[in-house]
Amino acid sequence: MRCTPLTRADGPIREFAQRWYQPEAQEASLNRLMAELLLRMPYSPGATQVQDSAADAFARSKGVCQDHTHVFLACCRALAIPARYVSGYVYSDNAEHVAMHAWAEVWLNDRWQPFDITNNTRRLNQHLRLATGLDYLDACPVRGTRLGGGGEILLTNAEVREHSQQAQQQ
């Protein structure tokens, strides 16, 4: 339940978490917290930067999947509920739109349970997990240090396809 600079809950986040959480109905109230968070912080590409904290994004009342996940983690940790950051991909029929995605997992009923705040869903049958960690920096796809002058560029390409059992058996 360690907080990081990106997932530290400030007063407004703690108040928000406590408003929607009921210990006697943990799973139901976490589902409600997820839905209310998305209403409070609509998906808004470009609203934040990767270094923005949960508190920064929550104060702006908008963000992307990384921000939704950081705020949800901050809420869970403020409530003393173990939670972790997950990064990966989500399958989409639109092959042109393949981008990293983030969601949370909460230790609930003796196992890690998913919460995709951006899509307001617990069914992750189209998600591909790449990494887990305390926050984005713990689970980001590329991270490093470079010494020296000159410019640099990093180009990546990802493809997420639906897996067919029938194709696997042939």
Predicted regions span which residues?
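Secondary-structure boundary elements
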Residues: 1-63, 71, 136, 147-167
